[in-house]
């Protein structure tokens, strides 16, 4: 080949190379400059999701500032539908469950099928099983195997996942469906996860697009046995409640108050959610996390109760029942051992100066934390511990009602301070068809001694002279049969009347008026009504709204938002000074009769405890529950007699000597102590909880 040809070939080859390089350069220039933004977007495609930030729920504290219900930080795993690519759900769930299992963390699912083979329907979950079959479009006789196969097919869970992981994935998918998983409603797969789990999930988050770690709050109940009925609990929102509250901004995964103050003050305690925007690239890696709206914590509440006094009153009620059960309660004290089968009791203490609840005991009770962990065990426990008898137990008031009859009779003028009614032991006005008896033969007595001896005849006649309409009119002023305005849902009770009898389908007789006059017939009151009655008498006709909330604060109690002011519900004090002077004097005389066998002698219980019988106004009752066979024991009263500070109402079911409960409540209020005494076998030893006589205790 000639030299010229070689040069020509080299030139052509060089031209080709240069041309190719030029074309490549042009293309590179086009990519980098002309279409650079296009390809940058392709390599950095992003997705931004909005995530809620849970707000802390307000706290609940007692009157001293002791925290009762509070929060602790809770990390949870959530799935966001907008970030979860269709068809990858099972693999993402598999990866998350693997990490949860590795660190011993639980997850949320309620599939009514056991998690281990051989699979079985869970016991006592018939409704859930029926719902599962219906959702899977299976017949009522479908087996557990039919259900599992339907779940696998419905959610496309292949057999590449071994059992029982395959079943666990199915459980999560089913729960996601139940919870309405969608772009606006993330699914909380697990909550309360450990720090190790959080760390590993974050490290491997790129492999689990749609998975997010969320920080929220768990409700914590401190000292769970203190006033559980008052404080209440929170729980997951139900479908019905969600439908009701959706317009108020609630979501399906929200936690709401379910009982007590948690429920009653839901709108106060609930915070306002915040939001954050999380941006991820096409690989699922987080690019940015920006809070667009800060969450607002809920307001905190301070109650009127002092935990120490509340616990003392609960122990006092329990101790009284324990003593009536014990071998130290002898026939020398009570020939018939009345009350020995008592199991249930309640007591309410009010501040007469503003109506605030100082203590509200109801027994049997429970531990809130046990309720949260094992609801069924508390629900099914003997004597219904979930029932707040202090506000929802309805009882005949018995002779405690005679204080109302006395007030009404004096105010109506059918009796006065010097009026006497002759008690022969039998009321003869309706003879011979109806001749109800009395507890004794008291002779000719005034209203003060009518109260002291609890003379049925005196109050039969007083009620008859008034007629039922006027008696009911005055009873209403004391709150009988009315809504007291209390924060928690409660019974209104009821007052005997012809209208009530008509509703109950009972024939009304004129003689029913006299039974109403002694707190029998169809009159029913709660212990809070009894305490309110006593407060109204102590205040000589002024009835405050009983309330359990003292104040509302910001979240950390550093700023007072609202202080609850006393609210007068009824005021009939004008011109009633002389009327209440007689009623007070009669109630003092009742306290003079409060004697019991202690340490070998009969002592006045109020003197024995150093209170002084002259300082206490009380009225006891023994209302019939079953005619002449079963009785409750009630008492209303206030202390001190002349300048009252507290009022109380007590009802002990199937019991006796509720005055012992009242005496110990007053003593605990004065001293800040209650000292129960039990022997080595757990028997309550002394009637009033201690073997201590004061210098004022005199034998009677």
Language-model features: locations:
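Solvent-exposed, polar/charged alpha-helical surfaces in well-ordered, non-transmembrane soluble domains
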Residues: 90-98, 191, 199-203, 228-232, ...
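Surface-exposed intrinsically disordered loops and tails
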Residues: 327-339, 598-608, 676-693
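Short helix-capping/linker segments at secondary-structure and domain boundaries
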Residues: 104, 235-243, 413-415, 539-545, ...
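Short, gly/Ser/Thr-rich active-site loops of penicillin-recognizing serine hydrolases
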Residues: 561-564, 661-700
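Conserved helix-loop functional segments at active or binding sites
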Residues: 319-326, 363-366, 589, 671
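Ligand-site clamp/hinge motif
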Residues: 296, 651-655
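Beta-lactam-recognizing serine transpeptidase/beta-lactamase-like catalytic domain environment
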Residues: 67-69, 75, 279-292, 305, ...
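Membrane-proximal periplasmic segments of bacterial cell-envelope enzymes
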Residues: 1-295, 318-346, 352
């Amino acid at each position: 080949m000639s030299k010229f040809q070689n040069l020509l070939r080299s030139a052509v080859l060089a031209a080709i190379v240069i041309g190719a390089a030029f074309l490549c350069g042009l293309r590179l220039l086009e990519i980098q400059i002309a279409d650079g933004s296009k390809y940058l977007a392709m390599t950095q495609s992003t997705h931004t999701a909005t995530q809620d930030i849970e707000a802390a729920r307000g706290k609940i504290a007692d009157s001293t500032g002791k925290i009762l219900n509070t929060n602790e930080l809770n990390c949870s795993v959530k799935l966001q539908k907008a970030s979860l690519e269709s068809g990858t759900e099972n693999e993402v769930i598999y990866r998350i469950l693997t990490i949860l299992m590795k660190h011993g963390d639980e997850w949320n699912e309620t599939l009514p099928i056991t998690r281990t083979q051989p699979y079985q329907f869970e016991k006592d979950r018939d409704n859930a099983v029926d719902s599962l079959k219906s959702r899977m479009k299976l017949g009522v006789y479908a087996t557990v195997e039919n259900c599992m196969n339907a779940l696998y097919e419905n959610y496309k869970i292949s057999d590449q996942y071994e059992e029982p992981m395959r079943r666990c994935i199915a459980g999560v998918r089913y729960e996601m469906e139940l919870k309405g998983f969608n772009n606006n409603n993330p699914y909380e797969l697990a909550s309360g996860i450990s720090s190790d789990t959080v760390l590993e999930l974050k490290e491997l988050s790129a492999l689990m697009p749609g998975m997010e770690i969320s920080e929220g709050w768990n409700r914590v109940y401190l000292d769970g046995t203190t006033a559980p009925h008052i404080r209440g609990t929170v729980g997951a929102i139900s479908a019905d409640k969600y439908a009701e509250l959706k317009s108020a901004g609630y979501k399906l995964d929200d936690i709401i108050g379910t009982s007590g103050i948690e429920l009653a003050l839901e709108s106060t305690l609930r915070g306002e959610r915040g939001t954050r925007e999380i941006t991820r690239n096409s690989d699922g890696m987080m690019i940015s996390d920006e809070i667009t709206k800060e969450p607002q914590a809920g307001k905190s509440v301070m109650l009127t109760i002092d935990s120490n006094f509340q616990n003392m009153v609960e122990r006092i009620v329990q101790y009284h029942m324990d003593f009536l059960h014990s071998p130290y309660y002898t026939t020398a004290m009570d020939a018939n051992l009345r009350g020995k089968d008592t199991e249930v009791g309640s007591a309410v203490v009010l501040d007469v100066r503003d109506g605030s609840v100082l203590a509200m005991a109801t027994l049997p009770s429970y531990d809130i934390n046990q309720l949260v962990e094992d609801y069924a065990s508390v629900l099914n426990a003997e004597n219904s511990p979930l029932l707040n008898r202090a506000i929802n137990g309805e009882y005949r008031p018995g002779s405690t009602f005679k204080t109302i009859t006395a007030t009404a009779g004096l105010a109506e003028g059918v009796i006065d301070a010097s009026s006497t009614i002759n008690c022969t032991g039998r009321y003869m006005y309706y003879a011979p068809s109806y001749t109800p008896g009395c507890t004794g033969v008291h002779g000719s007595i005034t209203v003060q001694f009518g109260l002291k001896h609890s003379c049925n005849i005196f109050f039969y006649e007083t009620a008859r002279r008034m007629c039922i309409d006027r008696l009911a009119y005055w009873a209403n002023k004391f709150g009988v049969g009315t809504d007291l305005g209390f924060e928690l849902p409660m019974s209104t009770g009821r007052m005997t009347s012809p209208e009530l009898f008509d509703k109950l389908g009972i024939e009304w007789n004129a003689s029913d008026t006299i039974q109403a006059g002694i707190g029998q017939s169809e009159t029913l009151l709660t212990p809070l009504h009894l305490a309110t009655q006593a407060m109204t008498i102590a205040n000589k006709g002024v009835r405050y709204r009983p309330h359990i909330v003292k104040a509302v604060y910001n979240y950390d109690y550093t700023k007072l938002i609202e202080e609850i002011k006393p609210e007068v519900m009824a005021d009939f004090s004008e011109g009633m000074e002389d009327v209440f002077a007689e009623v007070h004097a009669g109630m003092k005389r009742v306290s003079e009769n409060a004697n019991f066998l202690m340490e070998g002698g009969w002592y006045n219980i109020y003197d024995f405890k150093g209170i002084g019988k002259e300082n206490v106004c009380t009225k006891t009752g023994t209302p019939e529950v079953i005619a002449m066979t079963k009785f409750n024991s009630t008492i209303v009263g206030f202390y001190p007699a002349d300048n009252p500070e507290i009022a109380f109402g007590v009802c002990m079911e199937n019991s006796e000597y509720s005055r012992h409960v009242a005496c110990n409540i007053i003593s605990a209020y004065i001293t800040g102590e209650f000292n129960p005494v039990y022997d080595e076998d757990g028997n309550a030893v002394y009637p009033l909880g201690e073997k201590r006589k004061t210098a004022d205790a005199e034998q009677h």
